[in-house]
């Protein structure tokens, strides 16, 4: 199983800045554009009554004021990425993806 910190660095490379946040508390003041991600599931595959494969599922959200953000395109090309939805909140565009890592 790959580490979350490895995933974090890959997301930093996609974004091009360090504004990548893992489960940020509400008290943090984020800078944009940003990527926010959180763990959403840990599906297991079993064999002989043991877990033999475990891949963590993450919800990844690209947040940008630009509705045509190139970051969304780069995120969509991430291995295992699946686009979920787009919405606007507080004047910022949010594009959510599911990835397994």
Label each residue range with its predicted role:
Residues 54-65, 93-101:
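Oligomerization/assembly interface segments of phage tail-like spikes and tubes
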Residues 20-21, 69, 96:
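Signature of extracytoplasmic/envelope-associated structural regions
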Residues 67-73:
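Short, conserved charged micro-motifs
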Residues 74-101:
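Acidic-leaning, charged glycine-interspersed low-complexity segments
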Residues 1-42, 50:
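Small/polar-rich, solvent-exposed N-terminal microdomains that initiate assembly or binding
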Residues 29, 50-55, 89-93:
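A generic structural micro-feature
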């Amino acid at each position: 199983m790959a580490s979350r910190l490895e995933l974090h660095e890959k997301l930093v490379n996609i974004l091009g800045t360090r504004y990548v946040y893992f489960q940020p508390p509400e008290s943090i003041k984020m800078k944009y554009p940003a990527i926010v991600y959180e763990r959403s599931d840990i599906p297991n595959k079993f064999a002989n009554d043991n877990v033999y494969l475990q891949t963590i599922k993450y919800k990844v959200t690209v947040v940008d004021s630009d509705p045509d953000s190139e970051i969304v395109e780069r995120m969509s090309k991430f291995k295992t990425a699946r686009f979920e939805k787009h919405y606007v909140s507080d004047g910022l565009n949010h594009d959510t993806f599911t990835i397994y890592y």
